[in-house]
């Protein structure tokens, strides 16, 4: 195998190569960004008022026969369908790798049953083994969470230099609707505030960078998220939130940054109360040339709230139609007391290295 297992990877840096995502609005890829679709009335999911809720669901998923999985956990069966429906496009990302190059696979899928998780992994491994990609598969493992890519994809005991990260979730179900974690995020009745339940399957191809290695000459560098904890958003005035977000943007992406101005901003929950004013106002203050309407993408507008799949999906959305030398900022603002920020930083051009900023 051309890629030996290593254990000296930089825990704080990854190189993002490509990505693809299956969403209710359609397929998202590096050269395709579908138009947002309006949610549809669910035939089974009811709000607290007894009326049907609007949801973002993917139609035409792969037909699978897994009675044991259905018995163990209804949600696990839905996630299995999402994985299988997106798998062909996900595996095609591996064509970007040099020939005979080893890779790992990490599946992020929040299932409660360990036995169900084992079935998901076994089925995934079997499909890969039946393709020419199977010859170079290293480790394949399951992770419950997908919010932090650096933690999810870490390989302290060693791993292949490349990793295919598949992250799926669906919160259009009764259990997630009333869960404590999502009660203040998802809309709870027909006229309530919040995000519509949604689902997605995202796949991202990444390169694990070594601690001594230089920055990549292609692709985008993804460093660990900057995380700011703060008082609940509901207890603060708009100008206070806007000022705090502007300061966070300035700290995260200083004015003297050699990369210049990011070309795109992706936001996880633009539709939650106050987020549009908070993020939009701070962005204009920090970068007057950026319009959050034209240059921003709201995940919730495209496919509602997609749970643990949101981070991987935001990475794919940031890449969509992004040019090799452009950069993107990714904002996680759905939580009441926490804000997260990632940056996709493209290679620094020779002109920029020499001190000429043409941004």
Where are the regions that the model predicts?
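Conserved "HGTGT" condensation-loop signature of ketosynthase/thiolase-family condensing enzymes
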Residues: 1-162, 167-172, 178-359
């Amino acid at each position: 195998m051309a890629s030996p297992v290593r254990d000296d990877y930089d825990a704080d840096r990854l190189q993002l190569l490509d990505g693809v995502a299956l969403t209710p609005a359609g397929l998202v890829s590096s050269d395709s960004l579908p138009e947002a679709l309006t949610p549809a009335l669910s035939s089974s999911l009811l709000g607290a008022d007894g009326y049907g809720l609007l949801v973002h669901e993917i139609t035409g998923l792969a037909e699978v026969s897994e009675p044991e999985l259905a018995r163990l956990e209804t949600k696990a069966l839905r996630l299995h369908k999402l994985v299988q429906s997106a798998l062909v496009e996900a595996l095609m990302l591996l064509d970007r790798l040099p020939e005979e190059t080893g890779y790992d696979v990490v599946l992020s899928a929040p299932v409660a049953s360990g036995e169900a998780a084992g079935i998901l992994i076994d089925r995934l491994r079997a499909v890969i083994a039946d393709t020419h990609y199977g010859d170079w598969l290293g480790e394949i493992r399951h992770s419950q969470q997908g919010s932090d890519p650096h933690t999810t994809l870490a390989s302290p005991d060693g791993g292949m230099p490349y990793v295919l990260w598949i992250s799926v979730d669906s919160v259009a179900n009764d259990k997630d609707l009333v869960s404590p974690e999502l009660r203040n995020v998802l809309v709870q009745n027909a006229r309530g505030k919040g995000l519509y339940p949604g689902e997605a399957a995202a796949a991202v191809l990444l390169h694990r960078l070594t601690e001594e290695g230089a920055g990549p000459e292609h692709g985008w560098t993804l460093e660990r998220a900057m995380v700011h904890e703060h008082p609940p958003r509901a207890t603060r005035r708009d100008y206070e939130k806007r000022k705090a977000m502007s300061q966070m943007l300035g700290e995260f992406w200083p004015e003297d940054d050699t990369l210049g101005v990011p070309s795109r901003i992706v936001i996880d929950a633009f539709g939650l109360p106050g987020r549009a004013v908070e993020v939009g106002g701070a962005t204009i203050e920090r970068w007057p040339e950026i319009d959050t309407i034209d240059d921003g993408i709201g995940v919730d507008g495209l496919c509602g709230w997609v749970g643990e799949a949101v981070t991987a999906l935001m990475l794919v959305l940031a890449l969509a139609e992004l040019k090799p030398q452009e950069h993107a900022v990714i904002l996680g603002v759905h939580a009441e007391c926490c804000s997260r920020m990632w940056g996709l930083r493209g290679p620094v051009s020779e002109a920029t290295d020499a001190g000429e900023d043409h941004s």
